[in-house]
């Protein structure tokens, strides 16, 4: 992160208390944390399970900001992370509906406590003339990795929470961004908070 972003910022937890953490920490920091929920879902790794979960959101008009899914340490079980905005009441409704699906084993709202969140972004940027040194400088500031180099481009890999990735994109001249892909967020509870069978 740029040095100016290391100022202490308040963090709100689900219990309504707030603490101060530095922006550089990997604890999720969001302006409306209570409205942005990260749901972690264990479900059976079967054909159609993903489409039924997504269909539930669509049928009831719930929005999905990001979605990631992959097998867990048990290959018969997948873990899905859904980021969805909504009031606590709406998220409670979503959780109840998800728990009614046969394939769903367990649902946890990670935003009800402390958790770590990460997202991966690959961005191809123009790197010619003065832009080349500027892109290298920004990559270093945001602790990225240059994973591909040509005489005209850099491909940069960045990981962090969505605020960090958004801050990088704002720092780069839009005309320099040639292509970008993001994975969506995944999260895990801190300390003894675990989601398993």
Where are these regions (language model features)?
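Short, small-residue-biased leader/transition segments that mark boundaries at the very start
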Residues: 1-9
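Acidic/polar hotspots within intrinsically disordered regions
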Residues: 6-7, 15, 23-25
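Low-complexity intrinsically disordered segments
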Residues: 8, 17-19, 31
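Nucleotide-activated sugar donor-binding and catalytic core shared by glycosyltransferases
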Residues: 15-16, 156
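Long, contiguous binding/interaction regions
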Residues: 23, 30-38, 42-79, 83-197
């Amino acid at each position: 992160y740029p040095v100016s972003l290391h100022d202490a910022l308040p963090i709100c937890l689900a219990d309504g208390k707030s603490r101060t953490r530095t922006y550089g920490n990997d604890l999720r920091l969001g302006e409306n944390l209570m409205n942005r929920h990260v749901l972690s879902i264990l479900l059976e790794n079967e054909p159609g399970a993903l489409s039924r979960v997504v269909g539930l959101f669509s049928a009831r008009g719930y929005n999905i900001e990001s979605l990631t899914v992959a097998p867990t340490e048990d290959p018969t079980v997948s873990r899905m992370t859904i980021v969805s905005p909504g009031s606590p009441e709406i998220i409670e409704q979503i959780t109840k509906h998800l728990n009614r699906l046969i394939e769903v084993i367990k649902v946890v709202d990670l935003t009800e406590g402390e958790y770590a969140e990460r997202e991966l972004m690959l961005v191809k940027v123009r790197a010619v003339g003065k832009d080349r040194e500027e892109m290298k400088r920004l990559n270093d500031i945001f602790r990225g990795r240059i994973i591909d180099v040509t005489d005209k481009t850099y491909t940069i890999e960045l990981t962090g929470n969505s605020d960090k990735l958004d801050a990088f994109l704002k720092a780069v001249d839009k005309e320099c961004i040639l292509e970008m892909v993001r994975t969506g967020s995944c999260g895990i509870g801190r300390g003894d908070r675990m989601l398993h069978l």
